[in-house]
Regions:
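An active-site metal/cofactor-coordinating segment within enzyme catalytic domains
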Residues: 1-55, 63, 71, 75
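C-terminal active-site rim and adjoining tail of enzyme catalytic domains
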Residues: 96-99, 104-192
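Short, well-ordered coil/turn segments that N-cap beta-strands
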Residues: 2-4, 43-48, 69-72, 90-92, ...
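Short charge-dense sequence patches
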Residues: 4-13, 77-84, 104-109
């Protein structure tokens, strides 16, 4: 009953696209087909971010997205050879990556935005992203608690940077396990 998007890990099993971070060892998973049916039944068109966990599922995934008329989505984290295939298809909305170990996003000219991550600590500033903001790229930040680190300082710095850039809310997302806290933190005093 919230207005949050969903980050979903997808992979293939027995010729079907399923929701699973790891390769499943049993049949305890939900299919992407069923999840999209539920998503459509809810009636909200909230963002869906698909973390692609295996190669070769682009066409099946796009077919399911078309079946349910899903347009507010992004695919990301494909292998580099797979990203090349996604970039060749102008119908695909994919995110390139930038992180503390991936300084130059690949195929950015074909991407709709950036998945912004940091594996070894928080960024000292977000100034390196300004060129992407100026080019109107969508940004999705990975919150530090997903890597086992504290989120408070990162969230404070990110909020200050976002306010200084006057970014539209629909151009920036944060991937977090603390969605309610994030909503309050990033929207407090911003609604005035």
């Amino acid at each position: 009953n919230n207005n949050y998007g969903i980050e979903i890990d997808i992979r293939e099993r027995n010729d079907e696209i399923i929701i699973s971070h790891d390769i499943p060892i049993n049949d305890n998973f939900i299919s992407l087909d069923k999840l999209l049916l539920i998503y459509n039944d809810i009636g909200k068109k909230l963002p869906l971010l698909f973390n692609v966990k295996c190669d070769g599922i682009k066409d099946k995934t796009l077919s399911l997205l078309r079946k349910y008329s899903i347009e507010n989505y992004f695919l990301f984290d494909m292998s580099i050879p797979e990203t090349v295939q996604y970039a060749k298809d102008n119908l695909v909305k994919f995110l390139s990556r930038v992180s503390d170990i991936e300084e130059s996003p690949i195929l950015l000219d074909k991407a709709k935005g950036l998945w912004v991550d940091s594996f070894y600590g928080d960024y000292p500033s977000f100034s390196f992203l300004e060129k992407y903001v100026e080019q109107n790229y969508f940004l999705c930040f990975v919150s530090p608690e997903l890597h086992g680190r504290q989120k408070k300082t990162f969230w404070i710095k990110l909020r200050e940077w976002l306010k200084s850039k006057d970014l539209k809310r629909n151009t920036v997302l944060i991937c977090t396990d603390k969605a309610d806290e994030a909503y309050l933190h990033f929207n407090h005093d911003l609604e005035d």
